[in-house]
Amino acid sequence: MRNGGICMAGDFIITGGRPLSGTVRIPAAKNSVLPLLAATILCSGPVRLRNVPPLADVDTSLRLLRGAGGAACRQGGDVLVERAPTTCRLDAEAAAQMRASILFCAPLLARLGRAETVLPGGCRIGARPVDLHLSGLKALGAQCREEGERLILTAPSGLRGADITLRFPSVGATETLLLAAATAQGSTTLRGAAREPEIADLAAFLCRCGASIRGAGTSTIRVEGRRTLAGCTFAPMADRIVASTYACACAAAGGRVELTGCAPATYAPLLEILAQMGCSVECGPETAVISRFGALHGVGKVFTGVYPALATDAAPLLAAAMLTAKSESSIEDVIFERRFVCAEGFAAFGGRVETAGRTLHIAPARRLSAAEVRAPDLRGGAALVIAALAAEGTSRVRETGSIDRGYADFARKLGQLGAQITREMRPGA
């Protein structure tokens, strides 16, 4: 168990077959909070982020800021960054734990003229190269070199605006280039940009601090560099993947769950598929109510894609809900080639699954039964919890630390919905 209780190891013990009922308020999005914490490096004054959940990746981000000389801490449900980093080197151990650590390089480079890190970590769901980040930074005037496991970025003449076209709409690369361009000299036009709502959230934060950004949320973003940015208080957007998780849990286990505080429009493709499967889905501006009291049906083949398509992170969650459908489904993830490592766990529950390349095929299973499985990664681990909720008997999901990277109080919140789930710490965890 990590200090402060942020990242716990151990197992989830789940007795399935109980329908879910109740309300879940969706917290701030991890995939928004992490780039926002990186963006605080650009700010000359304090930054307060509201209602930030106690996630392992947030804890790692605070370690990165403090390790580079910044002053950052939690205050109740908020995160306060009182002072930006003063040194250019990111803590190697923390950086290696989290894919998003690469986002901290651009603002360090912009503020201090240099950034040093190790190649980032995160879930092993496929190749996630940083070449788009680096080629974009080079276009803005950065120089990049590798020394062993270390990546060193410098900008001897500062960063200057440029016209950049991404060959793929990478969310991380788009965020990196927004962070770099916000205080670069001159204008930057970014074409082929990612359109995810987290991009628009980052741009809204930067603009609140004094940046000039137009077009965030579209494929073309224009940035007028500003010499300095101020601090601000900001409430990050809600987590559409966490909302998707509880929606899929309700579909798998049955019952009625109300999700509040998260715009259904941000995860509409998933809700549409659940409706096609036989769930009742009622949506308001910030609320979705998912009900499932009858049988689920397969929907043929669906695909993930870049926003506004079905999110890649939602694919294993949706697959877990499809395990008990009365006809076939398949999901192809066009983003990551190893998204369905959790398929082995699905099979242990009795799911009739088969992987072929990036596609998971799901045939009707008469029933799911209890099993002992291992959480392979963040979303795959959550998907196995969902499968256990639908299975008959008592299951064990082992090595759940990866789940803590994206879900706060997961067992407690599921328990409040009526799930029978506890956490058991293993000796030495």
Functional labels for PLM-detected ranges:
Residues R2-A429:
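Short, structured segments at the rim of ligand-binding sites
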